[in-house]
Each structure stands twice: as structure tokens, then as C-alpha cells.
């Protein structure tokens, strides 16, 4: 289980450029980052910066090596290959989204 105490919502200025298999660059906004004690890793969840707020967005998730400031935008990103690790990331994302929805209703 991830340690939710370390969930950090993305800052407005935290953006990461990803390059796809065709060499195309796309700018992504950091949704949030978190640390997992179980896996000993940090994770970042991203969504395309070009998406508007009223559209459903595809969220990308990676483990990352933070820079000296703990920033995901300057560190190295790594794919998540383990199914159990994916399940943990999805659980944290669902909790984050549920918390965000409840805050909107307040």
C-alpha cells in the first residue's frame, strides 16, 4: 500500500515533455506525485497539458527518480511493468480522484 501522506498535487508550473515512439513531443501536466514505502519508489501521474478541464483525459503513470529538490520534471521516468505495482498506483489514483470529488461538493 502506498503511503498517502506523501501524495503531492502537481504545481501549475510542473510540466514534463514526453517523446513517443515516433519522436513526437507532447507536453504533460503533473497531476500529483507520491512515494510508496512498499516498493521504495516515487511515482508521478501526468495528463496531457493540451486537454481542457471538461474533457475526459488519459492519465499516464511512471515511477521516477526525483532530482535533488524532489521534483519529477527534472528526474528520470521509468515505466511500471509489474501488475501488483499498477494495482497500487490505480488505488492511489482512485483515492486521489475520490478526495478531489468530495472537495468539489463541499
Swiss-Prot record:
HAMAP family: UPF0473. This is UPF0473 protein LSEI_0788. Belongs to the UPF0473 family. NCBIfam families: PRK13678.1-2, PRK13678.1-4. It comes from the Bacteria. InterPro entries: UPF0473. It comes from Lacticaseibacillus paracasei (strain ATCC 334 / BCRC 17002 / CCUG 31169 / CIP 107868 / KCTC 3260 / NRRL B-441). It holds the Pfam family DUF1292. PANTHER family: UPF0473 PROTEIN CBO2561/CLC_2432 (PTHR40066), UPF0473 PROTEIN CBO2561_CLC_2432 (PTHR40066:SF1).
Amino acid at each position: 500500500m502506498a503511503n498517502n501522506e506523501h501524495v503531492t498535487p502537481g504545481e501549475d508550473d510542473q510540466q514534463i515533455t514526453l517523446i513517443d515512439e515516433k519522436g513526437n513531443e507532447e507536453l504533460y501536466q503533473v497531476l500529483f506525485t507520491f512515494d510508496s514505502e512498499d516498493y521504495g519508489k516515487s511515482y508521478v501521474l501526468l495528463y496531457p497539458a493540451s486537454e481542457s478541464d471538461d474533457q475526459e483525459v488519459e492519465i499516464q503513470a511512471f515511477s521516477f527518480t526525483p532530482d535533488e529538490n524532489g521534483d519529477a520534471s527534472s528526474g528520470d521516468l521509468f515505466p511500471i511493468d509489474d501488475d501488483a505495482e499498477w494495482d497500487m498506483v490505480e488505488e492511489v489514483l482512485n483515492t486521489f480522484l475520490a478526495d478531489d470529488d468530495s472537495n468539489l461538493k463541499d
